[in-house]
Amino acid sequence: MTPQITKIIRYSVQGFKPQYQSKHLKNINYHLNDFNINDFPEHLRYTIQKQHEEHLSFYKEHYQDFQYGIWFFIDGHKNNQSLNHLKYKVPCWEAEIENDVLLYDVNWEYQTTLSDQFGVNSGFYLPASQIHKIHNIKKRKSNKAS
């Protein structure tokens, strides 16, 4: 049986090659190693501690997935304008991804699917272990006005 697929895009010089997530891992490593509840105002500590414990459990369980991976969008929902945090223009790549893929939301707070509305609008994180679910990769031609 042929798997169901969704068209996706990614803005990156490296295309769909998984990248080490050093910037994003800093937050996880903070929760794993450096978190100190006494750094927060006393009236917020109960809530912050509760959130920290929820994140900590999730981060420990999925830490390997967060090491290497890629960020992508569902085709038709984002364009280069949405990437104004990038310092320079990067190429756009397109591909197809199997719908049964294991994904994470962009904030690394939960596992999700391609139908997650937050992900449809904000993008997804795909761990390197799931890269084999991407097919028909090609660089998208620029549609600059002449």
Label each PLM-derived region with a short phrase:
Residues D34, R45-K87:
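Extended catalytic/binding region for NAD+/ADP-ribose chemistry, centered on the ART fold
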Residues T2-S22, N27-D39, H43, K50, ...:
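Active-site and NAD+-binding cores of ADP-ribose-processing enzymes
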